[in-house]
């Protein structure tokens, strides 16, 4: 049951082959069994989930109209509001915060019949690409407990990868869905701005953060996206669902831009080989592939201005009281953010526009862009995010510029991007491929990912 996908679970619940009570009980036992080793959850809503499962079972027996995910368990990253369930932002600052309303995609999943089993771990305020916090400890990669699950949606990815619920909601402010998806061997989508409404952001107009689905397969992620996407007036970028975002894609004739590097010098050989094999597979199916030389490295500072200045503005005021109760990496990010000037912020806004225009120009030549998700397999679980990373035996540079340089540029530009598994490293760790599409091409991105997943399956038995 734990390895059954969300769509099959929903069908089996509708046809009374299995009970939502049994499904939820199995997931809650799995969470309890793995919490000490993996540590994917901050809060487990066991009582509420069991009560919801009983109501779901009664609805099935009564012949009521059922939603597409009726009785299916899901989890939510602890940066997203959940009505009546504490939302800590991964920090002691908000350890007792209980929202009075759901985030829009949380509400939509509940309305679709899905059952919340808990809130997953995140570094404080999602400030780094590894998942640990003084509030809850360290979240580990289920494929190798000495490695990171990635971040900042690390708990969500680790939970999905190990059967602690087939669906999760994550957030992606600079790769925070795609990094852990690649680290844990699952699928994660960063949507176009506004496709999945994000109404509780402090500054939606300059945000780089997006809410997206995480699942073990593209089909599940796509079905989840169908539920959570759609207009909401609380998000200024939200709009009615586009009519020109088809659910299928014909590979023959596609124009694909392949970006093996984007200003980074080093790429792990296993990563490069696995991703190139996926690209060449598409070429063999009739796609036209061109290697693109694009350098996003000069825009790393632009990304840091948004990240660090935002933290300084929103979290900095709490430092006199909580400064000794938060992670050193968060304090350092806030201190750096406080040093950026208003002119730096204005320049960052202009540079963000430059990134958007450069990426948009690429889509005049290509239908999709493809790249590795990460330049190397998962880092050590205790890696210092302010220290350089190594690839092979060489020092490769900063964690953003050397490990995930392929990701944050599309947070700046807003283009939809999905990470899906495409291979395994020599030491048995997942490797992710990123597919990027034009604005509002989210379903086309998922369609191409689904094509690769069907034709080049690389799933392995569930870890742990």
Positions of the model-derived regions?
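Short glycine/serine-rich loop segments
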Residues: 101-228, 411-423, 427-432
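Acyltransferase
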Residues: 20-25, 54, 269-293, 315-321, ...
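Acidic/His- and Gly-rich active-site-bordering loop/insert found
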Residues: 49, 59-135
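Residue-level signal for inorganic ion chemistry
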Residues: 27, 49, 221, 256, ...
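A short helix-breaking turn/cap at a secondary-structure junction
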Residues: 190-273, 277, 455-464
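An N-terminal boundary/leader segment
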Residues: 1-50, 284-286, 461-464
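Glycine-rich, small-residue loops and helix-cap segments
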Residues: 16, 27, 71, 111, ...
